[in-house]
Amino acid sequence: MDELVVKDLIDRLIDLSFAEDIGDGDHTTLSCIPADAMGKSKLLIKEEGILAGIDVAKEVFHRFDPTMKVEVFIQDGSHVKPGDVAMVVEGKVQSLLQTERLMLNIMQRMSGIATMTHKYVKKLEGTKTRVLDTRKTTPGMRIMEKMAVKIGGGCNHRIGLFDMILLKDNHVDFAGGIHLSLIHISEPTR
């Protein structure tokens, strides 16, 4: 998939997530943290696994507040263990507090998928079998979940209905059988 399309999908998910979580403002943070307060926060790893979502996390911070500084110590695809520091983020405390939960949710989900994928990939080493993903993803998070599969060593099968023909039972049933399905597939569709 085109990198600009991927970036657009990620940006839209981030914007939707901010609207969902922050709404008209984080009333707690805005009422008790001075606007000029500066701070630093680190992403401390709590479980062993494969790290995924660093680039998306950086986009979360910069999309909310372009002045935030992010220093990355561990890249996507790296094996991590409890106590590792993946990154340090520095900037306005209000910005740090309003972005932390979205960043954590994304990274935890992506790292969980990458870790599980990696476990299956390791079990299949030495065979000709590959781990492929499906379209059965969380609505709106498909691109990130598929990125996580790749980071974990798996392969992306197809992104959506648009990038290949995959004849399934429902198609065969509605087309009137496998033979008719195949005839229709060989005809131009557009």
Regions found by a protein language model. Name each.
Residues 2-182, 186, 190:
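Acidic/glycine-rich phosphate/pyrophosphate-binding loops and surrounding catalytic core
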